Amino acid sequence: MVSSTTPSSGEYLLEMSGINKSFPGVKALDNVNLKVRPHSIHALMGENGAGKSTLLKCLFGIYQKDSGTILFQGKEIDFHSAKEALENGISMVHQELNLVLQRSVMDNMWLRRYPTKGMFVDQDKMYRETKAIFDELDIDIDPRARVGTLSVSQMQMIEIAKAFSYNAKIVIMDEPTSSLTEKEVNHLFTIIRKLKERGCGIVYISHKMEEIFQLCDEVTVLRDGQWIATEPLAGLTMDKIIAMMVGRSLNQRFPDKENKPGEVILEVRNLTSLRQPSIRDVSFDLHKGEILGIAGLVGAKRTDIVETLFGIREKSAGTITLHGKQINNHNANEAINHGFALVTEERRSTGIYAYLDIGFNSLISNIRNYKNKVGLLDKSRMKSDTQWVIDSMRVKTPGHRTQIGSLSGGNQQKVIIGRWLLTQPEILMLDEPTRGIDVGAKFEIYQLIAELAKKGKGIIIISSEMPELLGITDRILVMSNGLVSGIVDTKTTTQNEILRLASLHL
């Protein structure tokens, strides 16, 4: 609810001051501040576990703060639900979109607040009002289209338009570009800037440092539940922000490339997948100890390559040769037996069993190998291997019985990589391995990948982050519309060259 506290000077739309929140045995927020001006885009940054989510849950009334004050447009607020916050002008666009896929766009826009004509929903008015908002924000989507037929970026636009329809003054955006193409990101940024022009205060959460400098005016950094700093972006460098986030200076974003790739271990020739639209005539070699990147725009069929190699997609033509011997992976089990491992793109939906413990998640890809002679599971060896995953992958956890869903994204990813290493692969394929992972944890993942390459593993990495590919790979295979448009040496190529190749067959 909104109290009648005396308004502040009006410099800020939102003032969260001295916010404290504790849970049993843990002080989650310790005197945290967040102040957002109108007509501004404010980055909220910190590693996973820094307190960003807890702070926002206190704002939305999901958690009740222990102490501190929250002022919105000069008046003290104390919301008890996200619905109450939304109705009072504070909205959030979540990373996991909150739309009903079976309903139309305009149904989603006005859900639970439909305009009516007598006893019936006024469909014409709903269409007109949706279209008017879309026109104002330059959103080209048919209000009558079913949401389930739209792209992720279009769904993001609907969420933003929905916030606009509530006349939101504060809009919080949580990793809004994680699944968007560069063109879609630019369109999203245009809409965000329109909201800024109209007087909104935008709180922008992202692990993509380049976006923060491209878009935001100010930044607030949290670390270990404490407020570290609020500063204008203009006076900061990327290294300074990283140092504030992690509490130390990161002298380098990527490990040194000390490894020299060896002989060819994998030869792929004219690989074509059966499912349409498909990859066509994909050819490349992978060397022992090499890190091969795969670049391309969304829709380039990068993931199709590793899924075909892993037996998830059926190939219709081409050959796969491992150590000079031609093989066929008809399914994932055959691929594992041939020494392939695949860390999938969607960590939470296809990579982990969030409500089960680290032990289960560490062993599930290799569980059949833990049966003893009488068919029972060897619990001692299972515990030992789980501990190996925790130790060798440097997983930060109280123990192997910890629910994996409670870990940070970086630690979840380490468990997944460790799980696959238990299968003793020669070829490790990673699809967007650092998506949604904070900057400190990213470096740890890069170190693990570099160490595995040094041990002779052949590694294939798909990434939408160009600095990541240029920073950790030896060569980059560029895809465009299902075709290989080039393979470049990372030492001599440029981002512009990769983007040119990625657009070659569009």
From Swiss-Prot:
Keywords: ATP-binding, Cell inner membrane, Cell membrane, Membrane, Nucleotide-binding, Repeat, Sugar transport, Translocase, Transport
Subcellular location: Cell inner membrane
Domain ABC transporter: 14-249, 264-506
Gene Ontology MF, one: ATP binding
Residues annotated as binding ATP: G46, E47, N48, G49, A50, G51, K52, S53
InterPro entries: AAA+_ATPase (IPR003593), ABC_carbohydrate_import_ATPase (IPR050107), ABC_transporter-like_ATP-bd (IPR003439), ABC_transporter-like_CS (IPR017871), P-loop_NTPase (IPR027417)
CDD domains reported for this sequence: ABC_Carb_Monos_I (cd03216), ABC_Carb_Monos_II (cd03215)
Enzyme Commission numbers on file: 7.5.2.11
One GO location term (cellular component): plasma membrane
Superkingdom of origin: Bacteria
Chain's role: Part of the ABC transporter complex MglABC involved in galactose/methyl galactoside import. Responsible for energy coupling to the transport system.
Assembly and binders: The complex is composed of one ATP-binding protein (MglA), two transmembrane proteins (MglC) and a solute-binding protein (MglB).
Family: Belongs to the ABC transporter superfamily. Galactose/methyl galactoside importer (TC 3.A.1.2.3) family.
The protein, known as: Galactose/methyl galactoside import ATP-binding protein MglA
Species for this entry: Shigella boydii serotype 4 (strain Sb227)
